[in-house]
Design a protein with these regions (language model features):
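Helix-start/capping segments and mature chain N-termini
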Residues: 1-67, 80-245
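Short secondary-structure capping/junction motifs at helix and strand boundaries
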Residues: 70-76
Length: 245
């Protein structure tokens, strides 16, 4: 039986504390939790892969959200062998962010697609955070990781899409990316080609956007020194926002 903690300082000491042996999901809650089933399914798959014990029951999560009256907030669920930790935070992205768009920077760190950890939301997130924070200090909103073969993988906190000649492309999961929930929504609702992409594809793209569960869909206005138009991305984002109302 896991210890349940909500916005508390106390947890049981286990491999999650000593070795970052744990997984997490970050869920957007508006009037209701967005993509809750998809998040819990992915969480339980991660629990199996990491050998962390029993699954999380989606009804338990629904009841927790209802009991705590959570709305218009971000819920993070962390699972270790002995703990389930809930925490909440405000939704940090503003209308101004979506109006202005984001700027991307290439990271010098390479993703390893042969590592299973690449495909999980595991607690060992230091590399992502270090590169993300470094880019922020340099005036960028997100970084782009290539993998060891030179293909585009993902951002520190996001999946990446490019648009060329009105066609949408995104890296294959096998290039070393987290199979994002919003990424999957885009693939299901638009004609998207999953293929190997490299940094030259970013330079030659007409438009670029990134996705994650809290951000939703964010247009990219600049990669390094390359600027982009955003008209098609704006339409995709509009459809997504209508979907999650």
């Amino acid at each position: 039986m896991r210890e349940i903690s909500y916005n508390k300082d106390y947890v049981k000491l286990d491999g999650g504390f000593y070795f970052a042996q744990g997984v997490f999901e970050t869920i957007l809650i508006k009037e209701e939790a967005v993509f809750l089933e998809e998040h819990i399914n992915r969480l339980n798959k991660s629990i199996d892969i990491m050998g962390l014990g029993e699954h999380i029951d989606i009804e338990f999560i629904k009841n927790f959200i209802k009991q705590e009256k959570l709305k218009n907030i971000v819920l993070k669920i962390v699972i270790t062998e002995k703990n389930i930790v809930f925490s909440t935070r405000k939704i940090k992205y503003s209308k101004k962010d979506y109006k202005n768009g984001f700027k991307l920077k290439l990271s010098s760190v390479l993703r390893n697609p042969t590592s299973m950890m690449t495909y999980l939301k595991a607690l060992s997130y230091n590399e992502n955070l270090y590169e993300y924070n470094k880019a922020n200090k340099e005036g960028f909103n997100e970084v782009v990781f290539l993998n060891i073969y030179g293909n585009i993988a993902e951002g520190a906190t996001s999946n990446i899409f490019i648009i060329k000649d009105k066609k949408i492309y995104t890296p294959k999961i096998s290039d070393g990316i987290l199979p994002g929930v919003v990424r999957n929504w885009v693939i299901k609702n638009f004609r998207v080609c999953e293929k190997h992409l490299d940094k030259e594809d970013l330079y030659s793209a007409d438009e670029v956007f990134i996705t994650n569960s809290i951000l939703g869909i964010m247009k990219i206005v600049q990669f390094e020194e390359r600027s982009y138009s955003t008209s098609m991305v704006e339409r995709i984002r509009s459809e997504y926002e209508q979907f999650i109302i």
